[in-house]
Amino acid sequence: MDSPIQIFRGEPGPTCAPSACLPPNSSAWFPGWAEPDSNGSAGSEDAQLEPAHISPAIPVIITAVYSVVFVVGLVGNSLVMFVIIRYTKMKTATNIYIFNLALADALVTTTMPFQSTVYLMNSWPFGDVLCKIVISIDYYNMFTSIFTLTMMSVDRYIAVCHPVKALDFRTPLKAKIINICIWLLSSSVGISAIVLGGTKVREDVDVIECSLQFPDDDYSWWDLFMKICVFIFAFVIPVLIIIVCYTLMILRLKSVRLLSGSREKDRNLRRITRLVLVVVAVFVVCWTPIHIFILVEALGSTSHSTAALSSYYFCIALGYTNSSLNPILYAFLDENFKRCFRDFCFPLKMRMERQSTSRVRNTVQDPAYLRDIDGMNKPV
């Protein structure tokens, strides 16, 4: 991902993940907007551009959004992981994938305080090591999340369209193995981000950048290559697979009235499929804008307006907001998660409700007795 400092410039600039992107100074003109870099690669057209003024309110608003994402996302995703570990009935194949998604989201929310600080200070004050860690977490989240959602969609496709094969494929153990493979595959990008990530002092605007550092001679080539790879492998291919899976599932659901031998099982199957579809749809909605921005910038079709730059910041914020939305979706759309959340948050109330339900059940099951005029108990 491009640094906002350089994204709308014609010359090479540091490429970074969204978490490492540095915003311009909220109270100043856009740093380095029309200034050529040290190798003089900026063209005369760039040099004539008027600098864009960014409202001081934008970094404050984004920081407020990140603060909410940090609290809701970290607490919510931690709670999701806890209930899956705590309750045996929650250890299903689908929930194992949800655990993986919650883990990736919880990790990326831990970077929110660092990003908020950068937005307010317009510089990276945390050193080189933390820079590498934050960039790496960001790329891990990006790839792990979309790969997990893709596997969740494939999992639902098998459950709906191939119920017999699902008995062998859809097991918690195999879901755990697939999750491990997802993290190993994402490591090809995450480890590369650790190696390439680092800090760089920009003396012309007196800021420290945290970004991916490519060789200066081939910077433009590596920058474009990275953007295209991220767009294709972290967005286009997974989304196409998801679309195919859900298209086939919709056709299957329309063609049969009863997917399984039981109406209860059929309701559960459709309910879980709907949950996964909503989670996937929300992810795509949240991340599509920033991917489009990056693709447009890579193709050189960029706008130099203040509105475009402001939109870019909010697209980044929208992507991170997704990490705090999933626990809310589970709570509203899945009865099992809702029940477990209530059990954790209100243990005394839930215990009393279970005891009350148990007493009612026992009363219904036991025969009622009436006392006759002789004082003898007779069942009714």
UniProtKB/Swiss-Prot annotation:
Output the GO biological process annotations, alphabetical, semicolon-separated. adenylate cyclase-inhibiting G protein-coupled receptor signaling pathway; adenylate cyclase-inhibiting opioid receptor signaling pathway; behavioral response to cocaine; cellular response to glucose stimulus; cellular response to lipopolysaccharide; chemical synaptic transmission; conditioned place preference; defense response to virus
**Compartments in which it is found:** Cell membrane
Q: Its GO CC terms? A: axon terminus; cytosol; dendrite; membrane; mitochondrion; neuron projection; nucleoplasm; perikaryon
Membrane-side (Extracellular) residue stretches: 1-57, 120-132, 197-222, 297-311
Q: Which residues lie on this side of the membrane: Cytoplasmic?
A: 86-95, 155-173, 248-274, 334-380
> Membrane-spanning regions, if any?
58-85, 96-119, 133-154, 174-196, 223-247, 275-296, 312-333
Q: Does the keyword Disulfide bond apply?
A: yes
Keywords on this record? Answer: Behavior, Cell membrane, Disulfide bond, G-protein coupled receptor, Glycoprotein, Lipoprotein, Membrane, Palmitate, Receptor, Transducer, Transmembrane, Transmembrane helix
* InterPro entries hit by this protein: GPCR_Rhodpsn, GPCR_Rhodpsn_7TM, Kappa_opi_rcpt, Opioid_rcpt
Question: Is Glycoprotein given among the entry's keywords?
Answer: yes
Q: How does it sit in the membrane?
A: Multi-pass membrane protein
Record-level Gene Ontology MF annotations: dynorphin receptor activity; G protein-coupled opioid receptor activity; neuropeptide binding; receptor serine/threonine kinase binding
User: Quick one: signal sequence residues?
Assistant: none
What does the UniProt record say this protein does? G-protein coupled opioid receptor that functions as a receptor for endogenous alpha-neoendorphins and dynorphins, but has low affinity for beta-endorphins. Also functions as a receptor for various synthetic opioids and for the psychoactive diterpene salvinorin A. Ligand binding causes a conformation change that triggers signaling via guanine nucleotide-binding proteins (G proteins) and modulates the activity of down-stream effectors, such as adenylate cyclase. Signaling leads to the inhibition of adenylate cyclase activity.
This protein's name: Kappa-type opioid receptor
